[in-house]
A protein has these predicted regions:
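Conserved catalytic core of the tyrosine transesterase superfamily
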Residues: 1-330
Length: 330
């Protein structure tokens, strides 16, 4: 069997690798190695798509010689993506392309001038409609009541889960939490290797802290996942929940609470919108959400026109009405 970076022996495409590269010297492999597993799969697929597009299917991400790419290649990729993909998807794939070329430059495989021109392609501009929504306070109450009306242990577990989601965590981050990641003194949760492999601290407000404490009184303080599955017999199963289990729980509680359809990620939108509504600055909110760029955080703001009106209303204009209210005479 050939190595991951070894090209086919009969691959004569001019952009194909002529000889195998060690993974430590392969720009695509170096780039992918720095990503979280989920992002790695997504970006590997993007790079495979780019390689196949450039070589009519002759190469994939590991058999393409990325150091041979020039502006004419990257410009052609951008043009093809504009026709084939939604702008968000196309820009994500172009970002992967730029990052691989950057690794090729760092590895001294591409001339700096050739690199500068190859990556000098603009992102695809678009004004996307807002996806998702923020949950209202009444909807959150309905979800919690649906959990509390469940006499089984799943009710307490699910309230704890929703409380953690309301602190802005992604569902993958929720199921990855361990008991040792929770600090009851501060209400802090250590989110390890979140998106982009970044660690951060999240914090639970008082009500959420009480909900988690009630679950922990049942769970106990032994090491392991913070949230456990509960089987049909009502017994705790000492293993980690899955992402899909979180989705199932939310769908179930949403139906029980007569809440309009929502996604797990809508809790992050709610968290960010509520914090901004409370007057928190966007830098602090972006850190709590685990965003490296505050511009990403701003995209989660679902407050709409009312928030803009209220923000302007807080501005002070140093004007006082004239004592003589009559219109000035000509």
């Amino acid at each position: 069997m050939r190595g991951a970076s070894e090209p086919d022996g009969d691959n004569s495409d001019p952009l194909a690798l002529s000889t195998p590269l060690p993974l430590t010297l392969h720009p695509a492999a170096v780039y992918l190695s720095g990503l979280a597993p989920k992002s790695r799969r997504t970006m590997r697929h993007a790079l495979n798509t780019i390689a196949q597009l450039l070589t009519n299917g002759a190469c994939d991400a590991m058999t393409l010689d990325w150091s041979k790419l020039r502006y004419q290649h990257t410009a052609a990729i951008r043009a093809a993506f504009m026709d084939k993909y939604a702008p968000t998807t196309a820009n994500r794939m172009l970002a992967a392309l730029r990052r691989v070329l950057k690794e090729a430059r760092r590895l001294k495989q591409i001339d700096p001038e050739d690199y500068d021109s190859a990556v000098d392609i603009k992102g695809i501009q678009h004004t996307p409609l807002l996806h998702g929504r923020a949950l209202s306070e009444q909807e959150v109450v309905a979800l919690i009541e649906a959990c509390l009306n469940d006499p089984n242990l799943t009710g307490l577990r699910d309230v704890a889960m929703i409380s953690i989601l309301m602190a802005g965590l992604r569902r993958s981050e929720v199921v990855a939490l361990d008991f040792s990641d929770f600090d009851p003194k501060t209400g802090g949760l250590k989110v390890r290797r979140g998106k982009g492999l970044r660690d951060r601290m999240a914090y639970l407000p008082t009500g959420a802290l009480a909900a988690l404490s009630d679950w922990l009184a049942i769970r106990g303080d032994e090491p392991g996942p913070l949230l456990y599955p509960v089987d049909k017999a009502g017994q705790i199963a000492r293993r980690r929940l899955t992402d899909q289990a979180v989705m199932f729980v939310l769908q179930k509680r949403g139906l029980q609470g007569n809440v309009e359809p929502f996604s797990p990620h809508d809790f992050r939108r709610t968290f960010i919108s509520d914090l901004l509504e409370s007057g928190a600055d966007v830098i602090t909110v972006s850190r709590l959400a685990g965003h490296s760029d505050p511009a990403t955080t701003a995209k989660y703001d679902m407050r709409g026109e009312v928030a803009k009106q209220q923000a302007v209303a807080r501005l002070k204009m140093p004007y006082r009405q004239r004592r003589d209210s009559n219109a000035p005479q000509a």
